[in-house]
């Protein structure tokens, strides 16, 4: 399955805990059955806040740039500062924000692409149809929380309980023979993108990896905990909770064991939180065989993009970190021999207004990804 089809067909989490016990051998045996060449994964990067992507991808051709500059006024980037992209679309050449040099190189090498004016849509519409209230619009349009859900669930007209990443793993039950929770791994805690009907997600810390239960280094605490877990007189609700907790503990053991075998990357990563998360994802991808998975989703949030003011200044600070993290991750995938097997994509709450509010830009609808 190629990456485009893998994404197209896509259209609850456990607690990260570990216990200082031996990992069940049966879990490790099943985890070694996956051939690396069959591996495929997608990495969803949420630019939380609503990134002003009209200053990430900018028209360079004279007429188109002049229209862009007229609409953006004080938010417009200098035409001479844009990083040129090879090729053109409908006679228009484009460039990237000057901070996106790594993305420029990948695009010009045919290893990256931009999707323009993309966002949740129930049905084709026009401004006139919207003004006449003649069409159905996505739920909660312009609302941060609503539009993040619309993106992650790919259900613009209803409030679905599952995300398209979770549904993707649900649809491939035979692909992952090892640890079920390893199909969806989050570096940013709970999210709707990875919520499936039959599968959940597992949260791992970028810096600390699998987090152990507080107190497990104390023998008395550990014995007391194990005694509670073995209590056969528990109620039905207690039993369900105990089983879920034990599954999380067992999963933590498997993840800890697998991560101890992760490839030591020679690719240098920056030390900011986003690059640290991308490095951890690369390490996790390197142990997919140990985890027994051939199809995975990863999720990470890079927040702080709600730039109602100082858009140019804040983007000049944040876009280099985004570009570096994505670029370093791709280099690490090449080092691992997985560059053609992992697809990374960005989503954001919504696009921004083309016009300036005098300080920055406000909530919009479609944007560039």
Task: List the model feature ranges, each with a label.
Residues 1-335, 368:
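Feature for exported/extracytoplasmic and membrane-associated proteins, marking the mature portion
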Residues 295-297, 339-341, 347, 364-367:
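Active-site lining segments that contact anionic ligands and/or coordinate catalytic metals
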Residues 309-314, 350-366:
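Short glycine/threonine-rich loop-to-helix capping motif typified by GTGT followed
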Residues 326, 333-358:
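Metal-dependent active-site segment of extracytoplasmic phospho-/sulfohydrolases and closely related
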